[in-house]
């Protein structure tokens, strides 16, 4: 008898490994893919396949990122791992690979190191909502008490950065020993090998602790306006890609940005590829016909949104990465009062950089190419801004930096 085809539609979650250099992020990534390949029949990835990460471009910045995918019984995961520390910083700030949760890898032999803390801080600021900890290199720690001390230190560090350090799941193990066992015998199943079982228990915690993200279509409607034209006898059409949510004919929307106050209108028609629609959803490239709006009232850079869900702002705090010379960025430092363009969604808005702060909160006077810095920005026009929003910093049309908003000031 032919076997029935077994299909499953599992919820999808994006995660990544973060942590200090050489604490075992890539080894763990390889061990997870190999262990789950054994149980779900997918393809495992070797360390060297993940380590040779291809270059990608996001917001004008080149980043090396490795993407792997795997499945547990409950979910499908897309997992991002970066080879170098600078790639992590760039990846998290540009949002090139959005993370719904992260596995923080800490060597049990060393405990939290400077980059451990930097990655936790970045995760908090760029809005990675949940973290699960893997205490790696357990085989190198002879004393169980030492491992407990490291675990306490990791929990305290997480609490320092406003993660719930007492609740975060912590799993100890050895990614290397698990990977070596799986390389010798790729068919190891649960219960056959102590080290491989620790990888399974880590993924059980990830399954249980990191919530399934809200789907884009369930969020409130937002579309950045890319182009505007008028249709004689019918009115004004704004086109763009629906960033999130859904919109139906007859619904009220707000036009936000580049003016002090939002304007409300009614959607009288939706068009996609010359066909009319009743409803448009996240991901659609669509033309939205708006009642009672003149062509001069709306322009590229504004957004259409569900009323009351997003407001225009001029001032915000952001975490920013400034490109170095080799990456095509500036060759010279810049100072407070620097006025570049901030490219947000679909448009450039000039802004003035009011102040800079280092990670420890100390003020700095100048920023060098290649630095990561916190800054306060004052835009000359209000635009629709929200926490977690990404932007590029440009100067004469070329990208000199990338940032993420973590606080709105007015």
From Swiss-Prot:
InterPro entries: EF-Tu_GTP-bd, EF-Tu_GTPase, EFTu-like_2, EFTU_2, G_TR_CS, P-loop_NTPase, Small_GTP-bd, T_Tr_GTP-bd_dom. Residues 136-139 are annotated as: G4. Pfam families: GTP_EFTU (PF00009), GTP_EFTU_D2 (PF03144), GTP_EFTU_D3 (PF03143). Residues 60-64 are annotated as: G2. It is found in: Plastid, Chloroplast. One of its GO terms (cellular component) is mitochondrion. Residues 19-26 are annotated as: G1. GO terms for biological process: mitochondrial translational elongation. GTP binds at residues 19-26, 81-85, 136-139. Residues 10-214 form the tr-type G domain. NCBIfam families: EF-Tu, PRK00049.1, PRK12735.1, PRK12736.1, small_GTP. GTP hydrolase that promotes the GTP-dependent binding of aminoacyl-tRNA to the A-site of ribosomes during protein biosynthesis. This is Elongation factor Tu, chloroplastic. It comes from Chlorokybus atmophyticus (Soil alga).
């Amino acid at each position: 008898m032919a076997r029935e085809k077994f299909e499953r539609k599992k919820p999808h979650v994006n995660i990544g490994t973060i942590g200090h250099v050489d604490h075992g992020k890539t080894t763990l990534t390889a061990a997870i893919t190999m262990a789950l390949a054994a149980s779900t029949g997918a393809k495992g990835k070797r360390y060297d396949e993940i380590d040779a990460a291809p270059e990608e471009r996001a917001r004008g910045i080149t980043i090396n990122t490795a993407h792997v995918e795997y499945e547990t019984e409950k979910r499908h995961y897309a997992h991002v791992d970066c080879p170098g520390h600078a790639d992590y910083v760039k990846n998290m700030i540009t949002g090139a690979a959005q993370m719904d949760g992260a596995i923080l890898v800490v060597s049990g032999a060393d405990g939290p190191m400077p980059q451990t803390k930097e990655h936790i801080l970045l995760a908090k600021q760029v809005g990675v909502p949940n973290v699960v900890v893997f205490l790696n290199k357990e085989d190198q720690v002879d004393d169980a008490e030492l491992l407990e001390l490291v675990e306490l230190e990791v929990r305290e560090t997480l609490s320092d950065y406003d993660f719930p350090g007492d609740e975060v799941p912590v799993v100890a193990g050895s990614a290397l020993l698990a990977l070596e066992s799986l390389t010798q015998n790729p068919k190891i199943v649960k219960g056959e090998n102590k080290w491989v079982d620790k990888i399974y228990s880590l993924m059980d915690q990830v399954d249980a602790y990191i919530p399934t993200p809200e789907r884009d279509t369930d969020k409130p409607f937002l579309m950045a306006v890319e182009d505007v034209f008028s249709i004689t006898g019918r009115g004004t059409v704004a086109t763009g890609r629906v960033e999130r949510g859904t919109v139906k004919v007859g619904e009220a929307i707000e036009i936000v940005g580049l003016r002090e106050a939002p304007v409300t209108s009614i959607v009288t028609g939706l068009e996609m590829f010359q066909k009319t629609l009743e409803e448009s959803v996240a991901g659609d490239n669509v033309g939205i016909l708006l009642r009672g709006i003149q062509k001069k009232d709306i322009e590229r850079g504004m957004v259409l949104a569900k009323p009351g869900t997003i407001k225009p702002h001029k001032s915000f705090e952001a975490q920013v990465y400034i490109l170095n010379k080799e990456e095509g960025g500036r060759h010279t430092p810049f100072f407070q009062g620097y006025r570049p363009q901030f490219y947000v969604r679909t448009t450039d808005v000039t802004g003035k950089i009011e102040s800079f702060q280092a990670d420890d909160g100390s003020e700095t006077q100048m920023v060098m190419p290649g630095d990561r810095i916190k800054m306060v920005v004052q835009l000359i026009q209000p635009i629709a801004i929200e926490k977690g929003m990404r932007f590029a910093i440009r100067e004469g049309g070329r990208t000199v930096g990338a940032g993420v908003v973590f606080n709105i000031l007015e």
